[in-house]
Curated annotation (Swiss-Prot):
Binds 1 Ca(2+) ion. This is Acidic phospholipase A2 CM-I. Ca(2+) binds at residues 27, 29, 31, 48. Negative results: does not have anticoagulant activity. Its EC number is 3.1.1.4. PANTHER family: PHOSPHOLIPASE A2, PHOSPHOLIPASE A2 FAMILY MEMBER.
């Protein structure tokens, strides 16, 4: 769920508050359209699409609780997760790892969605 996703982000990017990723570019945050502004925004676009695929399986990605571990910045989804838990956990894990590898460009925080994301 979103709370667990926030904690995963803190695991892989402890130096930056999670809310910096909640309003970034065209895809980090609620909804998303247009062309991603950079690599970090593309991480969010992929995450949005991953949640969409989980929904097609009948899952509720924003609410699904799953089991995972964070150890020294490394995330692992539990093998004991059911189909939906595993799908959502993997979406969040891939995104959190992607965030860790993408540069954060301050100018792309809180962009004007109407101007930049058509």
């Amino acid at each position: 769920n979103l709370y667990q996703f926030k904690n995963m982000i803190h695991c892989t990017v402890p130096s930056r508050p999670w809310w910096h990723f909640a309003d970034y570019g065209c895809y980090c945050g609620r909804g998303g359209k247009g062309t991603a502004v950079d690599d970090l925004d593309r991480c969010c676009q992929v995450h949005d699409n991953c949640y969409g695929e989980a929904e097609k399986l009948g899952c509720w990605p924003y609410l699904t609780l799953y089991k995972y571990e964070c150890s020294q910045g490394k995330l692992t989804c539990s093998g004991g997760n059911n189909k939906c838990e595993a799908a959502v956990c993997n979406c969040d894990l891939v995104a959190a790892n992607c965030f860790a590898g993408a540069p954060y460009i301050d100018a792309n925080y809180n962009v004007n969605l109407k101007e930049r994301c058509q």
